[in-house]
Amino acid sequence: MTTKQTVSLFIWLPESKQKTLFISTKNHTQFELNNIIFDVTLSTELPDKEPNAIITKRTHPVGKMADEMRKYEKDHPKVLFLESSAIHDMMSSREEINALLIKNNIPIPNSFSVKSKEEVIQLLQSKQLILPFIVKPENAQGTFNAHQMKIVLEQEGIDDIHFPCLCQHYINHNNKIVKVFCIGNTLKWQTRTSLPNVHRCGIKSVDFNNQHLEDILSWPEGVIDKQDIIENSANRFGSKILEDPILLNLTSEAEMRDLAYKVRCALGVQLCGIDFIKENEQGNPLVVDVNVFPSYGGKVDFDWFVEKVALCYTEVAKI
């Protein structure tokens, strides 16, 4: 009688991440998939016994968890991390993310990493960058400031930019964004309300936090249409889930799968969230954000998650 292979998966997550990710949790579960026995443990601490893989979300680039993670990787080189410190470091840099997306021909709005006001002026003069454009901090995650953003509407607004940063052409997209959540080749998607169409009306720039988009309601008159304010004043901007993007004719399953596969290959990441929009004029998909180990669109079933992670492990480990 042949003994079935057993694979040990260890999910290492802070309690705060567990609460935001899962509907309910289990400290331990075991199941069979593709003739393999998966033994799964969930904990806020690293394991004493070496598992086959550790699934984790590093909450900050520095600090106790980051130090423990790097040390464990060094001491246990055979353990597969989803995702590793190297991936988390890369995904913390908008400059690195965009460079890899551009290198691999992933469609994104025109984007430039800049370190000074003079660089921005040169980009505008050469028409490589045009108004309006969105300003994103270089750091993509782990801090409050990573979500503090600005839309520059007139050239005078350049004076308010904090450097270094990423300047990206602002694309009007009718207040809809498609979010694709990946666990390897397993995809989950949804449409959410997003930033509204903006207009140049003499205002230099406007600020917002992309995790608290209700700030948009206080923007000066003329920047966005009054109807957008009326329609969204009763809802928190960015938190309203709309119909399936396929039903809204925003995209197709084939397009989402193709885009997700290309982004994952470009960045070397398995657990990620991809945000893309469709520009109003041509309707082409443009990737505007990629993040590591996302929320998966709200709380998910623990058993569903670990089964998809196990499937992802078999894909990565080629077993």
UniProtKB/Swiss-Prot annotation:
Q: How is the cofactor bound?
A: Binds 2 magnesium ions per subunit.
Question: What is the native source organism of this protein?
Answer: Entamoeba histolytica (strain ATCC 30459 / HM-1:IMSS / ABRM)
Top-rank taxon: Eukaryota
**Protein name per its UniProtKB record:** Inositol-tetrakisphosphate 1-kinase
Cofactor(s) recorded for this entry are: Mg(2+)
Q: Where does 1D-myo-inositol 1,3,4-trisphosphate bind?
A: 17, 141-142, 147, 291, 295
Q: Which residues bind Mg(2+) 2?
A: 289, 291
Q: Which UniProt keywords apply?
A: ATP-binding, Isomerase, Kinase, Magnesium, Metal-binding, Nucleotide-binding, Transferase
Q: Which gene encodes it?
A: ITPK1
Recorded catalytic activity of this chain's protein:
1D-myo-inositol 3,4,5,6-tetrakisphosphate + ATP = 1D-myo-inositol 1,3,4,5,6-pentakisphosphate + ADP + H(+); 1D-myo-inositol 1,3,4-trisphosphate + ATP = 1D-myo-inositol 1,3,4,5-tetrakisphosphate + ADP + H(+); 1D-myo-inositol 1,3,4-trisphosphate + ATP = 1D-myo-inositol 1,3,4,6-tetrakisphosphate + ADP + H(+)
Where on this chain does ATP bind? 94, 136, 147, 168-171, 194, 288-289, 291
Entry function? Kinase that can phosphorylate various inositol polyphosphate such as Ins(3,4,5,6)P4 or Ins(1,3,4)P3. Phosphorylates Ins(3,4,5,6)P4 at position 1 to form Ins(1,3,4,5,6)P5. This reaction is thought to have regulatory importance, since Ins(3,4,5,6)P4 is an inhibitor of plasma membrane Ca(2+)-activated Cl(-) channels, while Ins(1,3,4,5,6)P5 is not. Also phosphorylates Ins(1,3,4)P3 on O-5 and O-6 to form Ins(1,3,4,6)P4, an essential molecule in the hexakisphosphate (InsP6) pathway.
In this chain, ADP is annotated as bound at 94, 136, 147, 168-171, 194, 210, 288-289
